[in-house]
Amino acid sequence: MSGIVYDAGALIGAERRASQVWALHDEALAAGVAPVVPAVVLGQAWRGGPQALLSRLLTGCVVESFDENAGRAVGRLLRDANTSDVVDAHVVLTALRYRSPVLTSDAGDLRPLVQAANSSIPIHEV
């Protein structure tokens, strides 16, 4: 496994003990791969409180920041895709940056963004 980017669906799946999410996560860590979580995805999934399973998942991950350059790139991608979800666009751009597939629960929202980015990054649905 070369890498993987988690969408909010993957984080929520981990919190709900989805075996497929945990199996892929454990496989990545065993291969020495740190999964990437865009910071905006963390904001979408984090609700405070202990969230022990999500916290456990995050200890093995890299959290990708969202800065001015990312904001501009996201805006351009949203324009090109004629859509408006900032989180989904940042997920796609993060996957492109890391040349990694995405683990998500809603591939349908990501595909137009991948297409607008003229890319073919793999999207794995859980």
Q: Which residues does each predicted region cover?
A:
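Acidic, PIN/NYN-like endoribonuclease modules and their adjacent C-terminal/linker elements
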Residues: 96-126
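Acidic catalytic patch
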Residues: 43, 61-81, 93, 107
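Short active-site oxyanion
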Residues: 31-35, 60-62, 96-101
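General small-molecule cofactor/ligand-binding pocket signal
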Residues: 36, 64, 122-124
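Short, well-structured N-terminal submotif of metal-dependent ribonuclease cores
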Residues: 1-37, 43-57
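Short, hinge-like loop/turn segments at secondary-structure boundaries
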Residues: 51-56, 81-82, 119-122
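Short beta-strand scaffold positions
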Residues: 37, 65, 86, 104-105
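Acidic, metal-associated active-site segment
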Residues: 85-101
